[in-house]
């Protein structure tokens, strides 16, 4: 996942501590660290980085933002604005945010965006087993063998996918609940079994679902949803 970075002296200045020029002097004096490394003039930091001055962590004066988007087909989940149809240009949000994870260009559905680097790491860390649910339509009839094999695990990308919940919706459609996020995982799993995905929609991330968000639109998470999300990830590893 790509993240937008800013200059370290701007980050320090934005805390209200001092000017950028004064921040550079602090950096040159060896008093600033990024994570566990002594900073150097010209360094840049992302939202997941931690910055320390004389051993004390500096916190940017930024209000946390949490957005749920019903991503339309064709939008690319990257912060790289050189990429056509990137999600940042699509939202055209006034402040710096980035997506939590990805949905590939031809998929649609729920994706969260934020400026909170800590929560991004906790949700995305593979060992945290957070559920994501999808509704998938394929090109031919779904049989019992397909459902059982998908649920048990499929060899892709030099590994075997984790066991997961798979339920049939109709002749060509199924629901699947994953606790990992390999690249194009569902499409690769289906291709291994000689099925082609015709439509893929993410409908849920943990207990946050897409209900009430029209296709292509977004809303802020409610205060109760944010509190719930914090509770869900409080024991997650960063």
Q: Whereabouts are the PLM-identified features?
A:
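Basic, flexible Lys/Arg- and Gly-enriched helix-loop patches that mediate nucleic-acid binding at interfaces
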Residues: 1-238
């Amino acid at each position: 996942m790509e993240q937008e970075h800013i200059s370290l002296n701007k980050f320090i200045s934005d805390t209200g501590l001092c000017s950028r020029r004064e921040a550079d002097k602090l950096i040159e004096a060896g008093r600033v660290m990024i994570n566990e490394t002594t900073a150097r003039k010209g360094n840049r930091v992302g939202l997941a980085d931690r910055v320390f001055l004389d051993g004390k962590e500096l916190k940017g004066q930024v209000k946390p933002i949490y957005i749920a988007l019903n991503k339309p087909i064709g939008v690319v989940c990257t912060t790289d604005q050189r990429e056509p149809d990137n999600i940042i240009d699509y939202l055209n949000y006034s402040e710096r945010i980035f997506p939590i994870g990805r949905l590939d260009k031809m998929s649609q559905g729920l994706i969260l965006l934020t400026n909170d680097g800590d929560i991004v790491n906790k949700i995305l860390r593979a060992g945290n087993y957070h559920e994501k649910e999808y509704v998938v339509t394929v090109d031919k009839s779904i049989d019992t063998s397909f459902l059982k094999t998908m649920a048990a695990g499929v060899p892709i990308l030099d590994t075997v996918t984790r066991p997961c919940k798979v339920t049939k919706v109709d002749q060509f459609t199924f629901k699947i609940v994953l606790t990992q996020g390999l690249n194009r995982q569902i499409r690769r799993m289906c291709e291994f079994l000689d099925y082609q995905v015709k439509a893929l929609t993410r409908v849920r991330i943990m207990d946050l679902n897409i209900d009430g968000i029209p296709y292509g639109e977004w809303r802020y998470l409610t205060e109760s949803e944010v509190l719930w999300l914090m509770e869900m990830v409080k024991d997650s590893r960063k």
